[in-house]
Amino acid sequence: MITESREHLQSKPQNSESIIRLDTPDDRPSLECDSLPSGGHSSKVSGGPASIEGKDVKNVSELETCATKAQTPHDEVPISTSKIIAVVGGLVLAVFCMSLDSTILSTAIPNIVSQFHSQNEMGWYVSAYSLTLASFSLAFGKIYTFYSTKTVFLITLSLFEAGSLICGAAPNSLALIIGRAIAGIGGTGMYLGALLLVAEILPFDKIPITTALLGAMYGIAAVVGPLLGGAFTDYATWRWCFYINLPMGGLTFLFVFFFVKRGKDKKRTREANNIVARFLELDPIGVALMIPTLVCLLLALEWGGATYSWHSWRLIVLYVVGGCCALGFVGVQIWRQDTATIPPRLLKNRNILGIILFSFCLNGSFVVLAYYLPIWFQSIKGVTAIKSGIMNLPLILTMIICSMICSTLVTKLGYYTPFLYLAPIIASTGAGLLSTMHVNSGSPVWIGFQALFGIGLGCGGTLSIVAAQTALPPEDISTGTAIVTFTQTLAAAVFNFVAQNVFQNQVLSGLAQSAPGVSAAKLTKAGPTMLREVVPADTLPAVLEVYNTAITRAFYVSVGGAALAIFGSIPLQWLSVKDRKTQAVTAHA
């Protein structure tokens, strides 16, 4: 808060020496500002409520100039345009690799199982990666809060590369699972670091379009992953599903290492006088409770009703352990307050609460369609897995194009809130129309409905990260970004679980009524692409109707998620990315 009015400031003599100081809590950074336009007088600036000493300030804009420099440490070390392009290109490659690892194994797993004779372990080839990807996201948010973004990013990139190398060279199933877990830990830190590096090296009004570019990698990987996995498996070896990460990750490492200057560790950590004190800054108790909480939750969602009964002792153990750890985690966060993994004060920020709800619902809505649309194409239209990926392109391409357009508009206009209002309205309409599809729906129907949902998703999918970063002061950006990315990952697990239960229950009840002679277990084992091979011709139409109904009922989950996302948009303030630096100063007033 500036303690003198504009009129009073302008009434000061313009030739006198002055000092401008923005006072802050002890753990906030400060710097000397000696480049005021009014005669080059020396000033001291630190972020926080302002007081003014001396006799000369030409106008308030001079104060804002100093404040801007204090609040944007990355502006102190400018990077050339060519280096920025190289670094952003490297970050895009890294995020693409991380996203690719979530989808590329879908067509390679049968060959891996055949080579390792590991039918009972194949579920862990996917789960080991997704579990660690979700479980460590908040922990890395805490680490990035205290340590150099460049340093932590390079470490997590190295972890991801090491995990990929272990997977590619795995002599047995256990080694592959361990490699996948290591890659997941590195991947979540690498993705978060990419978002934070973008926020550090770019002007804030250029961040939306770059974030959209990173987010587009998820959509591209969803389509390209199965195609690459199938190509590597058929024409080379499944091991190249992992080796492909090494050259791309290596290029990213070189760009970031040489072109991004290492920032200083945060002040609070620098003041810690020993290793133990630094370690305690990272909330180790909270992290130790959070990780088993998430692992228990995700395992329960994955195993429940599919691998084990909901009442089995394994699931009960997960409920008890997960519940106790969750209660302990909440207690630790309340106790540690500002040094917690999730500082409670952030959850009092209406923008953050809104973005959490918005991201959870909209991303969950997308995940359901991304999973069940290919099943609809394979089972109802009888196409191959690769062809179903191509038929899914209308959603992915419109999402990418609309995301880039909206991000460009945000860069020009400054405001992102209107797009976050539009996103759930358009997306829920598109998902609702997809839920009306039937067995004989033609290409104009499924292309148009997918495109409509893709437009809605593109309007708001990546802007949620930008909204969180705009609404938070610089010292909270890493934590806020981690919360949003964690929310998106958790949404994928929760919404898939709900949709899977809707789908399975509808298939069971539908077969019992329309095709009682067909075994649901037999259909599940065969998979959607083999539906016509295992079902007698005389009962195939009835089974297709059952499958179509089950899939479109699962789409209802997507409709509900997209519609609920509007309640996350409503609390958002109208903040501009163009005023981000000034808002960072006044946010503490």
From Swiss-Prot:
Glycosylation sites: N59
CC annotations in GO: plasma membrane
Subcellular location(s) of the protein: Membrane
Keywords: Glycoprotein, Membrane, Transmembrane, Transmembrane helix, Transport
Transmembrane segments: 84-104, 121-141, 151-171, 182-202, 212-232, 240-260, 285-305, 315-335, 352-372, 390-410, 419-439, 445-465, 479-499, 555-575
Compositional bias of kind Basic and acidic residues: 1-10
InterPro entries found in the cross-reference section: MFS, MFS_dom, MFS_trans_sf
Ranges for region Disordered: 1-54
Molecular function per GO: transmembrane transporter activity
Function: MFS-type transporter; part of the gene cluster that mediates the biosynthesis of paraherquonin, a meroterpenoid with a unique, highly congested hexacyclic molecular architecture.
Protein name: MFS-type transporter prhG
Organism field: Penicillium brasilianum
